[in-house]
Amino acid sequence: MKEQTEIGKLKDGRYMVVDDQPCKILGINTSKPGKHGAAKARIDVVGIFDGVKRSIVQPVSAKTYVPIVERKAAQVLSISGDMAQLMDLKEFTNFEIKITDDKKNDVEVGKEVTYIESMGMRKLD
């Protein structure tokens, strides 16, 4: 899910949607309005799920989408290779999630982990 907001209301550390990917804002630089133009904002972001750095330039008054990012808790049911089967502790739904190299030591069967969910995608936190 996502909601709409203006570029001028965004801040560092928040999230926005760029190229249909939820991204975390690394930095925002705004320029002064010129004689015939509106103020522009240059926004540097990094994808939450793909890790790709992106940069966009848009007018401060333009509209953009902000993803709803939720952190949830789950229990590890099983591990096979680099995939883990998790069960959400509130909804009791089962799903599989890829284990990244930096999280391999933290994931054990029976242990609770936190994960990020946004726009239908999930990632270990």
Curated annotation (Swiss-Prot):
Modified residues (Hypusine): 35
Subcellular location: Cytoplasm
Species per Swiss-Prot/TrEMBL record: Methanosphaerula palustris (strain ATCC BAA-1556 / DSM 19958 / E1-9c)
UniProt protein name: Translation initiation factor 5A
One record GO biological process: positive regulation of translational elongation
Sequence similarity: Belongs to the eIF-5A family.
CDD domains referenced in this protein's UniProt entry, alphabetically: S1_aIF5A
SUPFAM superfamilies associated with the record: Nucleic acid-binding proteins, Translation proteins SH3-like domain
GO molecular function, one term: translation elongation factor activity
Pfam families: eIF-5a, IF5A-like_N
InterPro entries registered for this protein in UniProt: IF5A-like, IF5A-like_N, NA-bd_OB-fold, Rib_uL2_dom2, Trans_elong_IF5A_hypusine_site, Transl_elong_IF5A_arc, Transl_elong_IF5A_C, Translation_prot_SH3-like_sf
Residues forming coiled coils: none
NCBIfam families (UniProt xref): eIF_5A (TIGR00037), PRK03999.1 (NF003076)
GO CC entries: cytoplasm
Keywords attached to this entry: Cytoplasm, Hypusine, Initiation factor, Protein biosynthesis
Keyword Transcription among UniProt keywords: no
Keyword Cytoplasm tagged: yes
Domain of life (superkingdom): Archaea
Function: Functions by promoting the formation of the first peptide bond.
